[in-house]
Every structure is written in C-alpha cells, then in structure tokens.
Amino acid sequence: TKVFHDHERHATQYLTTAGVLAVSSNTGSIQIGELLSHDTFYDYLTKFGVGSKTGSGLPGESRGILPKVADWSGTSAPTMAFGQGYSLTAMQATSIFATIANDGVRVSPTVIAGTRDASGNFTPAPGRTSQRVISAETAKAMRLMMESVVSGNGTAPSAAIAGYRVAGKTGTAQRIDDTCGCYRGYTASFIGFAPADNPAYVISVTIQDPKGLHWGGALGGPVFKKVMSFVLQSRHIAPTGTTFDPIPLNKKALAAKKAQDATANN
C-alpha cells in the first residue's frame, strides 16, 4: 500500500478546488484525479499535447514521455494527478497554459509569426493547427482559480505585478539524475499569464537543480514578475482595470462567502 502526503506535513485541510491549486496540494490533486477514469484522464493529457511534439518546428524537439494506460501501475494515476509519472518539455508545458489562456483552444506554437519580404509583404508562418480541449467556461474558471496561486494565500505571491491581474501555477518536482537513475535535487518552475482576465502573454520559468531554496514559487515567481513586467510595458499592454474577486480556498472561507451572499440577497 502506498500512502501519499503533501510535501509539507500539516493538519487536516478542507480545501476547495481553488485551494488545492493555490497551496499546490498533492493529496487534493489526487482526489480530483480520482473523479476521472484512467482513459478520460489520459485523453485530456493527450489533447493538451502531452506525449506529442508541439508542432513548433524546433529541431530536436522531444515528444516527452506519457505511458499508455495499459502500462500504468497501481500508483500511476495518483502520481500523475500531481505531475509525476510522465515528462514533458518546457514548450509543451507552456502550451498547456496558453490553451487555458486562449479560452480552451490549443494552437500549435510557432517560433516566428511569419516572414516579410523586401517589399514589406508579410507571410504568416504556415502549418498552425487548433483544437478545442476544454470549454471556454471551464477555461475561465481555471484562470480565476489560477489567480489564487498568485494571491497572498497562494504559493507564488512573488509573481504578482502591481496593477495587473496575474494567473499561474508553481512547480516543484523531484529531479531525475541520469547518472544514478534516481531522484536527486529539484526542478523549480512557474508558468503564468497576464492580464489574467484578458491574457496577452504566457511566460514560463524553469530552474534546474537549484541549491538551497528549491520552491517553484519562491524561485520562479520573481523571475516571471521581472520578465512579464517588461513585456507588458514594452508591448504597451494596459491593465484591464478589473479587480480579482478572491475565491474561497477552504471550507471555512466558502461557508463565510455563502453566508455573505445569502445576506446580500435578502
């Protein structure tokens, strides 16, 4: 029997789905994953591009590793629910976030937008494909929950940008050392997009085998903030002017919100 825990031991938590994302709960992710059959879970992974090349045209691009359902062990589904048991490239991971930012439609990435000849005529890059992966409503709900990650109660408050709504997710993964075939060190990451309510850019930060502090939010968040701040300013992307209405992250906050809403409706 395999017992799963969150990375940091804690008292029992009663989290909402947004709370599971905000605090990066492994056990919460497992419980959400259990709502899906293995085939459905695998189908969503493949639709998001896991296990296949992105179509970017980058030379040497890897497909990553996604085992077939028939090859899963008893622990595959739970570990895959929180991001272990398969591998993907930074381009693949960023493409997943771009799909959520793009209202659930996955568009194959391209290294260049196109070419312009001596006369100034622009020719778009060929071969881009698109596929709906999730509904626009689901994508919007995901974006709202991912804003909680960047809140003061999430794992990446250091990714917040003053005046802008930011959404994202941290990653702190055990790192495979090919020399021993064992886990050694960590891969810290943060991928996010802004403005969260009208996404314009997605930025991915990955730090391999950091020494000392190894949390994705603490390491990747500040880098994301600097890069995204520059991009938004240099591309003249103005703040949307809207504010983020915090989503309850746990049972107590959810009950309080329901009581507040009931009072407002009376």
Could you describe each region identified by the protein language model?
Residues 1-207, 251, 255-266:
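Beta-lactam-recognizing serine transpeptidase/beta-lactamase-like catalytic domain environment
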Residues 205, 222-225:
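Small/polar-residue-rich segments within soluble enzyme cores
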Residues 134, 183, 212-223:
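Short alpha-helix boundary/capping segments
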Residues 25, 56-58, 69, 230, ...:
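Low-complexity, flexible helical/coil segments
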Residues 235-259:
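Conserved catalytic/cofactor-binding microenvironments
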Residues 101, 150, 225-232, 236:
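Short amphipathic alpha-helical signal-transduction/dimerization elements
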